[in-house]
Amino acid sequence: VNAGTFVGTETKHLKWMIENIQQVVDIPCCIDSPDPKALEAALQIHKGTAMINSISLEEDRYDAVLPVVAGTDLKIVALCMSSEGMPETCEQRLKIADKLVNGLVKNNVPIDNIYVDPLVQPIGTDDTYGFEFLDSVAAITTQFKGVHTMCGLSNISFGLPERKYINRNFAVMAIARGLDGLIINPLDRDMMGS
C-alpha cells in the first residue's frame, strides 16, 4: 500500500487506504513509505502484523525506518541499496545485505521477519543483470539462514517488448534459486500459475 503520490497528505491517504483494504481482505498489508510518521500512523490502525517496505543502507532511510521496526514483530523488506547507489554485482549486494541483516538482528528484528530484496535491474540495460540477481538470491539464502528473499519482478523487463513472457520465465528461474516472494500483478493468471 503506497500513498506517496499524495505529497503533503500521504499519512491521511495511507490510513484511508489501509482501512478500506482491510475491510475487504483478511490479510496483512505491506506498507510502503519512507516517512516514519506515515508508517507509525498506518501501523496504529493496521490489523495484524504488517510488512514495511522498505529499509536500505541509504543513510536517511536507514536512520528513519530502523526505530519503527526495532524490537517489533513487523516484517521488513531490506532493500540492497546504499547511499552509493544500486549495486550491480552479487558481491556488492552481499555486502549490503550483510550490513542490513546484521543491523536488523542486532536491533531485535527476528531473522525470519527479514525479506532481502537484492534489486532486479533491467536486462535491456545490461544483459548480466539477470544473472547477477539470480546469483545474489542463491548467495543470500545460503549465507543468511532464515532470511527470506523477494523482489519487484517487472523491473527485469523494463523497456522490452512482450514483458509478461520475460517476467514469467524470470520468476520461475528466481524461485528455483531460492526466491521466496514477488511483487507482481496478481491479476495475471499465467504469472500466478508459473
Regions found by a protein language model. Give the residues of each.
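Glycine-rich, proline-tolerant flexible connector loops at the mouths of alpha/beta enzymes
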Residues: 1-27, 119-130
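Short, acidic/turn-prone active-site loops that include or flank metal/cofactor-
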Residues: 55-58, 81-82
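Short glycine-enriched loops at secondary-structure junctions
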Residues: 33-37, 58
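Short beta-strand/loop segments at the ligand-binding rim of alpha/beta enzyme cores
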Residues: 24-30, 47-51, 144-158
